[in-house]
Amino acid sequence: MTIRILPARLANQIAAGEVVERPASVVKELVENSLDAGATRIDIDLEKGGAKLIRIRDNGSGIDKDELGLALSRHATSKIHTLDDLEAIMSLGFRGEALASISSVSRLTLTSRTVAQEEAWSAYSEGRDMAVKLQPAAHPVGTTVEVLDLFFNTPARRKFLRTEKTEFTHIDELLKRIALSRFDVSFTLRHNGKIVRQYRAATTLPQQEKRLAAVCGNPFVQHMLRIELEHQGLKLHGWITTPEGARQQSDLQYCYVNGRMMRDKLINHAIRQSYETSLRVDQFATYVLFIELDPHQVDVNVHPAKHEVRFHQARLVHDFIYQALSSALVQGAQVMAPTINEGAFHLPHCAEEVNPPVVPMIDTTQQERVWQAVQNTPDYPRKAPRDNDRDESDNPQVRERAVSNPWVASPKTASTGKERYGSASVSKKEAAVYQTLMQTPDLSDEEPSTASTIVSSIEAVKANIAIEKLGKAIQVVAGQYLLMSSPQGCVLISLYQAQQLKLRGLLNAQHGALKAQPLLVPLALKLNESEWQVAQRHSSALLQLGIELKSRTNHSIMVMAVPQPLRQQNLQQLLPDLLSYAASCSESQALSHQALADWLTQRIVVEKRDYTLAEAIGLIAELEQLWQGNLPLQDPHFITLVDFSASITALHS
């Protein structure tokens, strides 16, 4: 067979097989051209799901008369001119194939006018006849592309089109994705003469959230968390939802790289990993995320439909997304967890302004990862199966303990879009829960007065009576201590010791070994021979603590997993120090779990000097839950009775 160069019309129709899959593909290419032209308003008109008519009108920069015919030629574009331009693409289109491919399988009319022109011009092209006809037209500054009778000259492809409703649904979903990528652009969608969607330009955050609600629905907005992070030239911003906002299908997953819609396996793998411990098998995360980075660090010319990209520093991008979302979910869980309602405090002073939490940035490691997991990841994140998918709230013992605990408020239901923090309006039920902590006790027969509490405190100090239980929180003293009442009198609690008790409670292994959480990237540690021997000798004790080590050579080990309390620590420095501590113990002395937990507690907990009353109460509430009422109330470093004798003597003198 003779080798020949294909005719232009045939080459365009072959290219159309990749570019023009269905009417939604035409809308995508034309709307992206409008966005590249700087349009701030785009109108989309459809008839019969786009099979009969697709009309895209914008107010962009327009196309000059002399370039109208060239615009319909294959590989003709204004986006790139050199190889350097191809390696630093910021525009959505760049191949110059869309208009030529569309015109080869439809009847296309391109009408445009630039600011410099006094009149508009129209170019007409029909499938079999590739000749372009120019004629004057009436049109404002901008461009209108009209596509009639899609696939009229390729019956084999036309018969694969679905019903009008199905094709319109694809276009509607496409427009939602585009509308979320450009909040500054107004979009109007008409179908068979009726306005179906209208998204007004959103320049402020409330307006953007309004568009989010219009596209993703109110449940998304009610459970969403806004994130914005930047690290080593990478920027991640957008919205994710708490696990309560998960759905049974993956229809609310929107990700963009430099403004381009993406369904990339690497990105989805990182997102799936961050939600892995939060969602059930049949749940899907919901998010709208924007990733911005140097265009030289990403290759967008790797997929015919440009749905996938290739990152030059894929490991850095993957870890950045994973750490950012994991930290945001942890912060969100702390905000949405049962908290003390400020509105129930009835304090005479105004409530302090609540600052948004700062998500910590954790340095990414530089070790080799197993990319097979990334390659096998589906297009949408799906959580891996777990041994126990039951929510903790399903346990009646947990529910009973949470309700009976006077320190913690009942879990809130989904927000209604209003402010999530406490307000002055509090129900009687909430007030009843918190009054045991926050309200000054009433002078009644059933409850001792403040004066009697002070007298009891004085008598208890003199008699050296043991403290049996805690009562009401009164005030934070010197930023580090919490003054509380008790049946034995007023007591002062060290909040620094309380933090240590909290971590010790988290590291408690009384119910078996702590659960080891695998690291996304195993950490390699270089050790000397003695440290390596210590790691081998005490591997079982470390595993009981949730630290899983794997030997590589006589001078290095791999840290495969750590317990949850250590996830946010600098393991590169902490673990060698832990092994040094283990080496300092005598060889005959068995290294107990308690000894390791005590050392970690002393090493990790940092003294804080500016506790608020709400923070102090929340800390004590966590202690009550962790220790289940068995707090060391006899520890003089943790709690002490307050002796008012000297103060009373001074008042009477």
UniProtKB/Swiss-Prot annotation:
Single GO MF annotation: ATP binding
Keywords in alphabetical order: DNA damage, DNA repair
PROSITE patterns for the chain: DNA_MISMATCH_REPAIR_1
Bias-annotated ranges (Basic and acidic residues): 380-389
SMART domains for the chain: DNA_mis_repair, MutL_C
Keyword Translocase appears in the UniProt entry: no
DNA damage is among the record's keywords: yes
Any one GO biological process: mismatch repair
A GO CC term attached to the entry: mismatch repair complex
Function noted in UniProt: This protein is involved in the repair of mismatches in DNA. It is required for dam-dependent methyl-directed DNA mismatch repair. May act as a 'molecular matchmaker', a protein that promotes the formation of a stable complex between two or more DNA-binding proteins in an ATP-dependent manner without itself being part of a final effector complex.
Annotated protein name in UniProt: DNA mismatch repair protein MutL
Organism of origin: Vibrio cholerae serotype O1 (strain ATCC 39315 / El Tor Inaba N16961)
Annotated gene: mutL
